[in-house]
C-alpha cells in the first residue's frame, strides 16, 4: 500500500471522511460537521470543468477571521488604508493590506469591488501547471499543479495580475490555510496483506468529498512554528511537509491557522497535525 493510498484510507472515504468547504457560506456559519466545514454550502461550489465556473471565498475566510464582523472590518480597512497594485487587465486593480505573512486582497474592476480573499506567503517550488480553469470573473482561476508525486488543483491567487495563469513549467509559491487543524494521535490500520500501517509521521492530502476544488483533508508533521498576526487577531503558521516522493524527499509549505480555528492545544514542533485546508498558489 502506497502512502497516497494509505492516506486515502485514513481520510478519504467512509465514516472517517470529512465534509467539504464550499465557497458560498459566511464566515460565521457554525454547522461545521467533523472538519468544521459546511457541506450544504459546498454543494454550490462546482468542480472544475471545461467551462468557466463561478466561485467565491466565503468559507475560505474562516481560516483567517473568527466572524463576519471581523471580516467586514478587515475589508473596510483594506479599502481605506491598503496599497493599490496594478493589473495588466484594463480597468482592474487590487488593494492589499496586512503586516507580515498574511494579507487581505480586494480585487476591483472600474473601482467596484469584485471579490476579496486572504493571501498567504508560501514556499516556492519548481513545478508544472497542467490545467487552468478560469472563474466567471475572468480575474480568478483554479490551477492544477504538479509537486513531486502529486498533481492537484489549487486556487491560483495570482491570476488577477494578467487575467489568467500560464501553463507549463515555472516557479509556483504554495501556501495552505487550515479550517480546523488539530494535534493528531497515532492510529494503526490493517493492510490488505495482513500487515499494519501507522499514521505516525505521514505527510499527505486527499480531496474532500463535497468540498471546494482546492479543499483537502491532510495530515503532516510540524517542523517549525511561528506566531503571526492574522489581521486583528493572532494566529500561527506551521512549516510542514505537504507530500514526499518515493525517495523520502519532502515538499514543504507554510500551513496557516487562526487561533480561533485550532481545535485544542496549539501544535508544537514534532507534533502530527491533521484537518482540512485549502491550497493557494502564486505562479511567478
Task: Place the predicted regions along the sequence by residue.
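Short nucleic-acid-contacting surface segments enriched for D/E, G, S/T with interspersed K/R
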Residues: 259-274
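Long, hydrophobic alpha/beta structural blocks
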Residues: 77-215, 235-236
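OB-fold (S1/OB) nucleic-acid-binding surfaces
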Residues: 224-253
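N-terminal ordered "arm"
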Residues: 2-15, 29-113, 272
Amino acid at each position: 500500500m502506497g502512502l497516497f493510498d494509505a492516506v486515502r484510507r485514513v481520510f478519504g472515504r467512509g465514516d472517517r471522511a470529512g465534509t467539504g468547504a464550499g465557497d458560498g457560506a459566511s464566515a460565521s456559519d457554525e454547522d461545521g460537521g467533523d472538519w468544521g466545514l459546511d457541506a450544504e454550502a459546498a454543494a454550490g461550489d462546482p468542480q472544475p470543468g471545461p467551462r468557466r465556473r463561478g466561485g467565491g471565498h466565503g468559507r475560505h475566510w474562516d481560516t483567517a477571521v473568527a466572524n463576519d464582523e471581523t471580516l467586514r472590518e478587515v475589508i473596510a480597512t483594506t479599502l481605506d488604508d491598503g496599497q493599490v497594485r496594478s493589473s495588466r487587465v484594463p480597468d482592474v486593480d487590487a488593494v492589499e493590506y496586512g503586516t507580515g505573512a498574511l494579507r487581505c486582497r480586494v480585487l476591483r474592476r472600474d473601482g467596484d469591488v469584485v471579490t476579496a480573499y486572504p493571501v498567504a506567503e508560501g514556499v516556492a517550488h519548481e513545478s508544472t501547471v497542467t490545467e487552468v480553469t478560469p472563474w466567471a470573473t475572468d480575474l480568478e482561476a483554479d490551477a492544477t499543479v504538479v509537486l513531486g508525486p502529486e498533481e492537484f488543483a489549487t486556487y491560483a491567487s495570482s491570476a488577477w495580475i494578467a487575467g489568467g495563469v500560464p501553463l507549463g513549467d515555472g516557479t509556483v509559491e504554495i501556501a495552505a490555510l487550515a479550517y480546523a487543524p488539530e494535534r493528531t494521535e497515532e492510529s494503526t490500520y490493517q493492510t490488505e496483506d495482513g500487515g499494519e500501517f501507522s499514521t505516525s509521521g505521514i505527510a499527505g492530502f486527499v480531496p474532500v468529498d463535497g468540498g471546494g476544488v482546492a479543499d483537502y483533508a491532510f495530515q503532516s508533521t510540524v517542523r517549525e512554528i511561528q506566531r503571526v498576526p492574522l489581521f486583528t487577531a493572532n494566529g500561527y503558521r506551521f512549516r510542514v511537509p505537504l507530500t514526499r516522493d518515493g525517495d523520502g524527499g519532502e515538499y514543504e509549505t507554510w500551513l496557516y491557522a487562526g487561533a480561533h480555528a485550532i481545535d485544542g492545544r496549539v501544535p508544537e514542533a514534532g507534533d502530527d497535525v491533521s484537518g482540512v485546508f485549502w491550497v493557494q498558489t502564486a505562479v511567478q
